[in-house]
Amino acid sequence: MPTSSPAAAPTSPVPTYLPWGRTARRLDWAHLPPQVRFDVEARLGSPVVADSTLTHGYVPVIETVLTLADGTHHLLRAASTKAQRSFAASLRAEAAWLRTLPETVPTVRLTHLLDGDWVVLLLEHTAARLPHRPWREDDLVRCLEAVSAAAVALTPAPGEARPFAEDLADWMGRWDILEGREDLGTPMQLLTAGRLAARLPEVTAGDTLVHTDLRDDTLHLTPEGGVLLDGWAWPVRGAAWLDPLLLLVGPCGDGVDVEAVLRRTPLLARVRDEDVDCVLAAMAGFFLTSCDLPVPAASPWLREFQRWQGEAVWGWLRRRRGWE
């Protein structure tokens, strides 16, 4: 059987028509019920005079930067507990984790939580930007350094997070669904991918709090040179190297030489090649099957994003295994 090849070369970017930075379908501040808007202004101590809805990401919660009459700025996230039950639960979970994270982890800080018919998170607003797309080396280096430092700060894992492979158990059986997909590879290659994915519990075990969703729309680069890690709704417990590896999916799709990046990233360079392949196989199976599900009306770009990620990860794994 072919073994992993850490000397795999970069390839051309994976084609996509995703409008990076404009993928979210969201309501505006004005669509919040009057009482909720009144409660927000009461908590913040000043009337809202302007708002700017954020359009990155794939979650259809209200997300907007509020400008108050006193000149301050605040970030608001909100979801209806009736019309958006799962997203409201996600915001509650995010609020709980933001209160759990140690101060040494750079993130957007929670200032207020309103929990009624609407779950509303009020967060500190920081003048920051998203990484450039396509990914640039300087942005990627900054983000990897921040994510690696956070892994140290989050070991041992604070709070009560489920193990990586338990929370994401659905990743492991996806290659059964893809059986017979000749466009993806030979039957033996697909069988091998499934066997690799099945080893997820073994290779991902650890005692680090793992974000699992760090990418260009959850990493915010500050003018001072820092990086904020955002979107802490559903972290898990696992190996310290998982977040740096998962972060490389986007750059891989943009044509970055992720193997060279992997070799010079300390947390990744010491990981067994086969262990990396196991995670890549599980991810590829998940994305390549999820992208075929119906397109959610509230997130019209989600399936295209999953297709793009799936093709990027699968191509990366194929190059590492010598299947191309």
Regions found by a protein language model. Give the residues of each.
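Juxta-kinase regulatory segment immediately upstream of eukaryotic protein kinase catalytic domains
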Residues: 2-52
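Short Pro/Gly-enriched beta-strand edge/turn motifs at strand-loop
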Residues: 42-50, 93, 174-176, 192-203
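Active-site acidic catalytic loop and adjacent metal/ATP-binding pocket
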Residues: 55-68, 74-76, 196-242
